[in-house]
Protein backbone atom coordinates (compact mmCIF):
# COMPACT_ATOMS: atom_id res chain seq x y z
CA UNK A 1 0.00 0.00 0.00
CA UNK A 2 1.36 3.41 -0.84
CA UNK A 3 1.96 5.69 2.11
CA UNK A 4 0.09 8.93 2.29
CA UNK A 5 2.07 12.08 2.18
CA UNK A 6 1.63 14.55 4.96
CA UNK A 7 -0.41 17.52 3.88
CA UNK A 8 1.51 20.73 3.61
CA UNK A 9 1.08 22.68 6.80
CA UNK A 10 1.98 26.34 7.09
CA UNK A 11 5.24 26.81 8.97
CA UNK A 12 4.77 27.88 12.59
CA UNK A 13 5.04 31.61 13.19
CA UNK A 14 8.16 32.79 14.99
CA UNK A 15 7.75 34.26 18.47
CA UNK A 16 8.05 37.85 17.22
CA UNK A 17 5.26 37.48 14.67
CA UNK A 18 2.96 35.90 17.28
CA UNK A 19 3.70 38.75 19.70
CA UNK A 20 2.96 41.31 16.97
CA UNK A 21 -0.35 39.63 16.14
CA UNK A 22 -1.37 39.71 19.81
CA UNK A 23 -0.37 43.34 20.29
CA UNK A 24 -2.61 44.42 17.40
CA UNK A 25 -5.63 43.01 19.25
CA UNK A 26 -5.05 44.62 22.69
CA UNK A 27 -5.66 41.44 24.75
CA UNK A 28 -5.85 37.74 23.85
CA UNK A 29 -9.37 37.49 25.38
CA UNK A 30 -10.68 40.58 23.55
CA UNK A 31 -12.55 39.15 20.58
CA UNK A 32 -15.57 41.40 20.14
CA UNK A 33 -15.20 41.48 16.37
CA UNK A 34 -15.11 37.69 16.02
CA UNK A 35 -18.10 35.37 16.09
CA UNK A 36 -18.77 33.55 19.39
CA UNK A 37 -17.03 30.23 19.83
CA UNK A 38 -19.07 27.07 19.47
CA UNK A 39 -20.59 24.88 16.80
CA UNK A 40 -22.14 27.03 14.07
CA UNK A 41 -25.16 24.74 13.86
CA UNK A 42 -26.19 25.68 17.40
CA UNK A 43 -25.38 29.37 17.20
CA UNK A 44 -26.94 29.97 13.80
CA UNK A 45 -26.49 33.04 11.64
CA UNK A 46 -26.48 36.49 13.22
CA UNK A 47 -29.91 38.11 13.57
CA UNK A 48 -31.19 39.91 10.50
CA UNK A 49 -33.86 42.57 10.20
CA UNK A 50 -35.01 43.79 6.79
CA UNK A 51 -32.26 41.72 5.18
CA UNK A 52 -29.46 43.61 6.93
CA UNK A 53 -27.25 41.60 9.30
CA UNK A 54 -26.56 43.22 12.64
CA UNK A 55 -29.31 45.84 12.25
CA UNK A 56 -29.89 47.46 15.68
CA UNK A 57 -33.66 47.40 15.07
CA UNK A 58 -33.63 43.61 14.95
CA UNK A 59 -36.13 41.94 17.29
CA UNK A 60 -33.55 39.43 18.47
CA UNK A 61 -30.72 41.91 19.06
CA UNK A 62 -30.14 42.42 22.75
CA UNK A 63 -27.26 43.70 24.82
CA UNK A 64 -24.55 46.22 23.98
CA UNK A 65 -24.11 47.23 20.32
CA UNK A 66 -20.74 45.46 20.09
CA UNK A 67 -22.04 42.00 21.03
CA UNK A 68 -23.28 39.80 18.23
CA UNK A 69 -24.59 36.77 20.10
CA UNK A 70 -28.10 35.63 19.29
CA UNK A 71 -30.40 35.94 22.25
CA UNK A 72 -33.66 34.14 22.99
CA UNK A 73 -36.76 36.29 22.46
CA UNK A 74 -38.17 37.54 25.77
CA UNK A 75 -41.46 35.61 25.53
CA UNK A 76 -39.68 32.27 25.15
CA UNK A 77 -37.15 32.86 27.89
CA UNK A 78 -37.29 31.90 31.55
CA UNK A 79 -38.63 34.30 34.19
CA UNK A 80 -36.16 36.91 35.42
CA UNK A 81 -33.80 35.72 38.12
CA UNK A 82 -34.64 36.66 41.71
CA UNK A 83 -33.10 39.97 42.66
CA UNK A 84 -32.72 39.29 46.35
CA UNK A 85 -34.33 37.72 49.36
CA UNK A 86 -34.59 40.77 51.63
CA UNK A 87 -37.68 42.70 52.62
CA UNK A 88 -36.14 46.05 51.64
CA UNK A 89 -37.56 46.16 48.10
CA UNK A 90 -41.14 45.45 49.13
CA UNK A 91 -41.14 48.04 51.87
CA UNK A 92 -41.83 47.41 55.52
CA UNK A 93 -45.09 46.18 56.91
CA UNK A 94 -47.09 42.98 57.37
CA UNK A 95 -48.27 42.72 53.74
CA UNK A 96 -44.87 43.22 52.12
CA UNK A 97 -43.69 40.08 50.43
CA UNK A 98 -40.16 38.77 49.96
CA UNK A 99 -40.81 38.68 46.24
CA UNK A 100 -40.45 42.44 45.81
CA UNK A 101 -40.55 43.47 42.18
CA UNK A 102 -40.21 40.50 39.88
CA UNK A 103 -42.18 38.14 37.72
CA UNK A 104 -45.59 39.06 39.20
CA UNK A 105 -45.12 42.84 39.13
CA UNK A 106 -44.50 45.47 41.78
CA UNK A 107 -45.33 44.20 45.26
CA UNK A 108 -47.71 41.62 43.81
CA UNK A 109 -48.44 38.49 45.75
CA UNK A 110 -47.33 35.18 44.20
CA UNK A 111 -50.00 33.03 42.53
CA UNK A 112 -49.84 30.44 45.32
CA UNK A 113 -51.05 31.59 48.74
CA UNK A 114 -48.68 31.02 51.60
CA UNK A 115 -49.50 30.67 55.27
CA UNK A 116 -51.51 33.63 56.46
CA UNK A 117 -52.39 34.75 52.91
CA UNK A 118 -55.79 33.14 52.54
CA UNK A 119 -56.72 29.54 51.98
CA UNK A 120 -56.78 26.82 54.61
CA UNK A 121 -53.68 26.65 56.75
CA UNK A 122 -51.93 23.33 57.17
CA UNK A 123 -52.29 23.31 60.94
CA UNK A 124 -56.08 23.50 61.01
CA UNK A 125 -56.33 20.88 58.27
CA UNK A 126 -54.25 18.33 60.15
CA UNK A 127 -55.91 19.04 63.50
CA UNK A 128 -59.32 18.45 61.94
CA UNK A 129 -58.20 15.18 60.36
CA UNK A 130 -56.67 13.91 63.61
CA UNK A 131 -59.72 14.69 65.73
CA UNK A 132 -62.61 12.69 64.19
CA UNK A 133 -65.22 14.21 66.53
CA UNK A 134 -64.96 17.45 64.58
CA UNK A 135 -65.66 15.76 61.25
CA UNK A 136 -69.13 16.33 59.82
CA UNK A 137 -69.59 12.70 58.84
CA UNK A 138 -68.70 11.35 62.31
CA UNK A 139 -72.33 11.30 63.39
CA UNK A 140 -73.15 9.04 60.44
CA UNK A 141 -70.25 6.70 61.21
CA UNK A 142 -71.15 6.56 64.91
CA UNK A 143 -74.75 5.55 64.19
CA UNK A 144 -73.85 3.02 61.47
CA UNK A 145 -71.41 0.92 63.50
CA UNK A 146 -72.65 0.09 67.01
CA UNK A 147 -70.09 -0.17 69.82
CA UNK A 148 -68.26 -3.50 70.22
CA UNK A 149 -69.78 -4.23 73.68
CA UNK A 150 -73.41 -4.24 72.51
CA UNK A 151 -74.93 -7.44 71.07
CA UNK A 152 -74.43 -7.68 67.31
CA UNK A 153 -77.67 -7.53 65.34
CA UNK A 154 -77.39 -8.48 61.68
CA UNK A 155 -79.06 -6.12 59.26
CA UNK A 156 -81.40 -7.77 56.75
CA UNK A 157 -79.95 -7.08 53.28
CA UNK A 158 -82.15 -9.51 51.37
CA UNK A 159 -83.52 -6.68 49.23
CA UNK A 160 -80.00 -5.92 47.88
CA UNK A 161 -78.20 -7.73 45.03
CA UNK A 162 -76.34 -10.94 45.93
CA UNK A 163 -72.59 -10.56 46.55
CA UNK A 164 -70.81 -12.18 43.58
CA UNK A 165 -67.78 -13.22 45.60
CA UNK A 166 -69.90 -14.79 48.36
CA UNK A 167 -71.96 -16.76 45.83
CA UNK A 168 -68.78 -18.16 44.15
CA UNK A 169 -66.45 -18.76 47.11
CA UNK A 170 -68.82 -19.05 50.06
CA UNK A 171 -67.15 -16.19 51.93
CA UNK A 172 -66.51 -12.49 51.44
CA UNK A 173 -63.50 -10.48 52.49
CA UNK A 174 -65.73 -7.65 53.76
CA UNK A 175 -67.81 -10.01 55.93
CA UNK A 176 -70.36 -7.93 57.90
CA UNK A 177 -69.32 -4.66 56.23
CA UNK A 178 -70.18 -5.80 52.70
CA UNK A 179 -72.87 -3.70 51.04
CA UNK A 180 -74.31 -6.72 49.20
CA UNK A 181 -76.54 -9.62 50.29
CA UNK A 182 -74.91 -12.77 51.68
CA UNK A 183 -77.60 -15.49 51.58
CA UNK A 184 -77.97 -17.24 54.92
CA UNK A 185 -75.69 -14.78 56.76
CA UNK A 186 -77.30 -11.33 56.60
CA UNK A 187 -80.69 -12.50 55.42
CA UNK A 188 -82.71 -15.64 54.66
CA UNK A 189 -81.03 -18.29 52.48
CA UNK A 190 -81.97 -18.48 48.82
From Swiss-Prot:
The keyword Metal-binding applies. Residues 1-94, 110-130, 142-161 are annotated as: Disordered. Residues 37-48 have a biased composition (Pro residues). Gene3D superfamilies: Zinc finger, CCCH-type. The keyword Zinc applies. GO terms for molecular function: zinc ion binding. Keywords: Metal-binding, Zinc, Zinc-finger. Pfam families: zf-CCCH (PF00642). This is Proline-rich protein 3. It comes from Mus musculus. The gene is Prr3.
Amino acid sequence: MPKRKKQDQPPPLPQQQQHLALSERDEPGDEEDERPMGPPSLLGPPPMANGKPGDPKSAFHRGPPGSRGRMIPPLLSLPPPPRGRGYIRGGLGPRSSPYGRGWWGINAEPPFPGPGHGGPSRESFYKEARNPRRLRSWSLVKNTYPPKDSPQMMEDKSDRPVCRHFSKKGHCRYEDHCAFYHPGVNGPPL
